[in-house]
Amino acid sequence: MRKNKKNTKISFLIRTRNEERWIGHAIQSVLDRVYRPEILIVDNNSTDNTLRIVKYFQHDPLLNELDHPSGKNYTDIRILNIKNYTPGAAINYGVKKASNEIIVIMSAHCILKKINLKKHIKDLNNNVCIFGNQIPIWEGKKLTKRYIWSHFTNTRVQNMFSKLENRYFIHNGIAIYKKKILKKYPFDKYLLGKEDRYWAAKIIKKKLNFLYDPSLEAEHHYTDGGSTWRIQGKV
């Protein structure tokens, strides 16, 4: 499996609360496609095995990769605990702590399938966000893309407008930003959901652009607590 080049510095930001079922799969999918990224886990008081599983992937600084090739399956992972959680507050906190300029926000129950950092970073020169295709998965079954999932087509779209929601549409299931943009235009920390849509509206008012690119792709797995799934039918 081809990975992105070693000299690309990137931080993944993953928000968690009791994500033991998928968090290991999510992290492994990142390591399979991106060389030694920084991964920031912004955790909202998980009470299951989420954080124990995360620690399986933490890089041991004493590990010599030349002597232990399996070290490629580890990376720099930091666990950040947040009080008074909201989606926007968690992202803003992770951005503040991120070491790298390129930031990927990914759901804890998404599996990264495709990413071309060279291409996406180039697109960030003309767009403040690149968000990607999501394939809805329920109990292993790929679902027909209805309701919110119908936005995730096979065509690139700049400044996507949702007729379903009657507003501009970005989805942080898998999305790439520059740190300096997110520091200048942080997410609304008071919103309990849809922080990405409100952010899109703010960006449009600033006469900036964002891009949907299906060549950035993730499988989005069903969870009982998943906000994207709560208002959707499973079939």
Language model region names:
Residues 28-37:
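Short, acidic, metal-binding catalytic loop of nucleotide-sugar glycosyltransferases
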Residues 103:
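Short aromatic/hydrophobic "clamp" motif used to bind/position activated sugar donors
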Residues 206-231:
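Active-site donor/metal-binding and catalytic loop motifs
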Residues 157-177, 192:
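A recurrent flexible, glycine/aromatic-enriched loop bordering the glycosyltransferase active site
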Residues 69, 82-98, 119:
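Glycine-rich, basic loop-to-helix element that forms the pyrophosphate-binding segment
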Residues 115-144:
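Conserved donor NDP-sugar-binding/catalytic core segment of glycosyltransferases
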Residues 192-199:
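Acidic donor-binding loop at a coil-to-helix junction in glycosyltransferase catalytic cores
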Residues 29, 43-52, 110:
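A conserved acidic beta->alpha catalytic loop
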